[in-house]
């Protein structure tokens, strides 16, 4: 009975955590630290997200994306520099600017051409992955193998933001309050061109956006609509979009998703996202937290056994 009550308490907490704030990605450093401490308090010390969440540096050696986007890890990660000519890393205190070199290289290259191709001054880059990938204490179900990245739907300003600003300011929502369409006061033609530029990259497998953004893109796209196939509607994503790369060649343990179905995705499959069922879904209880044994075997070597000292340190934000 005690075990059942304990399990129910954990599930109730995690459900509240998942449903209380649809804009969790905009949490400030203080809010993020509080969430992490609360999560750790409700999880067993051997939970995979606790073990990977406390790692502060990558492993040495060649890069390898191991496993699937939502169940894996990353060796040999590299960090996107905090500042670049056409990008700035946001929420740096989270220490989630690590990725597979294939993704980091793509972000730097696309950022460089956005001013001329999309009239977009530069990228504000959100979460990529932890230093060794793996499940995160807060936020994402994916972003585990260094091939996912969140990009803010806010253009880079004409100055360098301070570190406190990067941890505090919020991105701009481009979706109307009722979720039925974009907000015409914040959506611009440059947003479409930004998303199209990323979608035309061969290495990009999917781009997740709010369904209202997909609706706008379907309406605004020209005759060449092939790139719309990669634009996939998903809940949230009204402040940022989420790019996902296919598995790079030479990473034998990386598991790509099945490609999106053919077609622009602008028909009945998009209409469903504006039904009551999709707009106000009934929350489901989360499953049990992943353990190292739930991940590919190679991931066990990337996360050290739990210690009380490490858990205490990771309750804050690095």
Residue ranges of predicted features:
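Envelope-exposed proteins and targeting segments
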Residues: 119-124, 145-149, 203, 237-241
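Extended, low-complexity, intrinsically disordered C-terminal regulatory tails
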Residues: 53, 106-138, 208-230
């Amino acid at each position: 009975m005690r075990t059942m009550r304990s399990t129910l308490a954990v599930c109730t907490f995690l459900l509240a955590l998942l449903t209380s704030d649809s804009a969790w990605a905009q949490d400030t450093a203080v809010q993020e630290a509080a969430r992490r401490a609360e999560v750790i308090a409700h999880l067993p010390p051997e939970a995979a997200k606790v073990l990977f969440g406390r790692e502060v540096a990558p492993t040495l050696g060649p890069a390898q994306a191991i496993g699937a986007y939502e169940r894996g890890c990353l060796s040999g990660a590299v960090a996107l520099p905090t500042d670049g000519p056409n990008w700035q890393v946001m929420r740096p205190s989270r220490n989630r600017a690590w990725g597979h070199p294939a993704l980091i290289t793509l972000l730097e290259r696309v950022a460089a051409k956005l001013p001329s191709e999309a009239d977009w001054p530069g990228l504000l880059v959100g979460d990529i992955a932890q230093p060794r990938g793996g499940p995160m204490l807060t936020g994402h179900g994916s972003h585990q193998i260094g091939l996912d990245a969140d990009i803010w739907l806010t253009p880079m300003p004409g100055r360098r933001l301070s570190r406190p600003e990067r941890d505090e300011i919020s991105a701009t929502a481009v979706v109307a309050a009722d979720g039925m369409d974009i907000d015409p006061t914040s959506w611009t033609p440059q947003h479409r061109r930004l998303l199209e530029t990323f979608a035309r990259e061969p290495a990009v497998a999917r781009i997740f956006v709010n369904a209202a953004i997909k609706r706008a893109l379907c309406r605004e796209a020209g005759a060449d609509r092939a790139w719309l196939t990669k634009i996939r509607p998903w809940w949230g994503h009204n402040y940022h979009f989420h790019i996902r790369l296919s598995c790079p060649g030479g990473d034998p343990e990386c598991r790509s998703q099945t490609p999106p179905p053919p077609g622009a995705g602008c028909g009945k499959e998009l209409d469903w996202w504006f039904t009551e069922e999709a707009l106000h879904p009934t929350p489901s209880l989360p499953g049990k937290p992943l353990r190292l044994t739930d991940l590919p075997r190679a991931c066990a070597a990337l996360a050290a056994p739990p210690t009380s000292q490490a858990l205490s340190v990771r309750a804050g934000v690095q």
